[in-house]
UniProtKB/Swiss-Prot annotation:
Gene3D superfamilies: Enolase-like C-terminal domain, Enolase-like, N-terminal domain. Mn(2+) binds at E226, D251. Keywords: Aromatic hydrocarbons catabolism, Isomerase, Manganese, Metal-binding. This is Muconate cycloisomerase 1-2. Homooctamer. The gene is catB2. InterPro entries: Chloromuconate_cycloisomerase (IPR013370), Enolase-like_C_sf (IPR036849), Enolase-like_N (IPR029017), Enolase_C-like (IPR029065), Mandel_Rmase/mucon_lact_enz_CS (IPR018110), Mandelate_racemase_C (IPR013342), Mandelate_racemase_N_dom (IPR013341). Its EC number is 5.5.1.1. Pfam families: MR_MLE_C, MR_MLE_N. Catalyzes a syn cycloisomerization.
Amino acid sequence: MIATPVKIESVETILVDVPTIRPHRLSVATMNCQTLVLVRIRCADGVVGVGEGTTIGGLAYGEESPESIKVNIDTYFAPLLKGLDATRPGAAMATLRGLFQGNRFARSAVETALFDAQAQRLGVPLSELFGGRIRDSVDVAWTLASGDTTRDIDEAERVFEAKRHRVFKLKIGSRALADDVAHVVAIQKALQGRGEVRVDVNQAWTESEAIWAGKRFADASVALIEQPIAAENRAGLKRLTDLAQVPIMADEALHGPADAFALASARAADVFAVKIAQSGGLSGAANVAAIALAANIDLYGGTMLEGAVGTIASAQLFSTFGELKWGTELFGPLLLTEEILTEPLRYENFVLHLPQGPGLGITLDWDKIDRLRRDTRKGASITMN
């Protein structure tokens, strides 16, 4: 039976500034605060869907900032969405794509909210709209990004002993190449036999630097190298993939299905980091995964350091993937000092457990969010490197 149409009544975008538990140092920026971009869509039947379009480091990571995401949703997306049928998320998103260019993060936030509302309406978890779960939990890596070797080792020891994480991704690329390599090798030696070490360069190296470091990482048994060179250098990424003794993962080079197809056709990566926001939404991310699987490229569930909404939306989708060899890094809420859910996400025994309820399966603490929202608390703290 075709669902009775339900009008979208309102679309609200909220910026929420939350300090991090420690400085989070990337090659492009050092974050002391994360700005969550939340979207709340109210429907005529009383259902409320939520989504998130959070990015990293303001404008340091990509072409959308928290502020631009909010302005573009409020100014362009919201007026168009009001009055559309909320029971047809695909049709609503097709309308947006047909009229507006780019804005992948903004589109992702809106699409998540629409799918959350529709799954609630149907009384099923959001994952059911993408074929259903294959797993009820996902492995979660932890990112070590203080920039201090001793501190990173101590942090890894703590979360490992707490049975929260046993895979560690090291953010590197902001220091001299030899210093970065020494930092990684020291941590790998400290954790050897207990935890797996991977590195994320965030495009900071040249091709020759990546070759030099890759040989040393292979000798040290580092498991994975993420986006070592510029995203637009696909030919270089292919050369590294062909040469490397350590698997190469594409991240910033993946802006959706078209990039996934180009990279897969060129065999320019061993692994794809799938991110819902970077892919333009849940549907785009599902298509990226399908292309990877067809090309026999491994999958990894990436993060934009989202809060609970974006994190669990990602987990809902990743739970439907037939293959998720490299697990996920859906640790974003654990990096934040404030909890925005009435019941926190459950991280236990090295995995994130998916909730069983309808939609995203979470309940937001709107009183807390109102206290943290940008119009009552100013200032995301970002240091550019």
